[in-house]
Amino acid sequence: MDHEDMIKVDASVRERCGTGSARALRARGLIPAVIYGKNRDPINISLSQVDFLKKCRTFPIFSKLIELCIGEKKEYVITKDIQKHPVSGAIAHVDFQFVDQDAEMKMEVPLVFLNEQKCVGVKRGGVINILHRSLIIRCSPHHIPKSLEVDLIDVAIGHSLHVSDLKLPSTINVVMKEEDPVIATVVASGGGISEDAEEAAPASDIPEAGK
């Protein structure tokens, strides 16, 4: 286990919950948060607004393993959700998920599309249709990618890019419902979508945390 590769965050157990208690914490510069997970009771905690916001700006907060120091106890978690105030942008609440460091976990990772304007098909008047903007993967908590790159440069009109065409890290496995789904296709302008794309109309691939 490489502790140097983790984000370390100090936290405190909060005894009281509810809107009033959360408002009081925020007034003191603290963020109300919760840790939850399979076969574990949730733990309500608070953490420093300034410290956690700095971590969010410094690290890929949704793809880095976090060591939460709660008094003398340590919990290993990943960030599942961050709620922000709609006006001030201050962090209003954070959801963390317990992590078993020795077990693989299932999660959704965004796709980053490269060379859209340089794409062969686009240069010849085609239009890119993106079928999936994220993938469901299974991997160790120590190898969660921030994102996965999809290079569109060589996709011609009438051609599609499948998951099997991507250069993916050896540390992850894609676990989508479809077998080798189409990620993107290039069609002639005004020419509809390809047969591959029709078959690959994205289903609801919502991951079950930790499965």
Swiss-Prot record:
rRNA processing listed as a keyword: no
Superkingdom field: Bacteria
One GO CC annotation: cytosolic large ribosomal subunit
One Pfam short name: Ribosomal_L25p
Keywords: Ribonucleoprotein, Ribosomal protein, RNA-binding, rRNA-binding
GO molecular function: 5S rRNA binding; structural constituent of ribosome
Biological processes annotated in GO: translation
The keyword rRNA-binding belongs to this UniProt entry's keyword annotation: yes
Similarity comment: family membership: Belongs to the bacterial ribosomal protein bL25 family. CTC subfamily.
Assembly behavior: Part of the 50S ribosomal subunit; part of the 5S rRNA/L5/L18/L25 subcomplex. Contacts the 5S rRNA. Binds to the 5S rRNA independently of L5 and L18.
Function, as annotated: This is one of the proteins that binds to the 5S RNA in the ribosome where it forms part of the central protuberance.
UniProt name for this protein: Large ribosomal subunit protein bL25
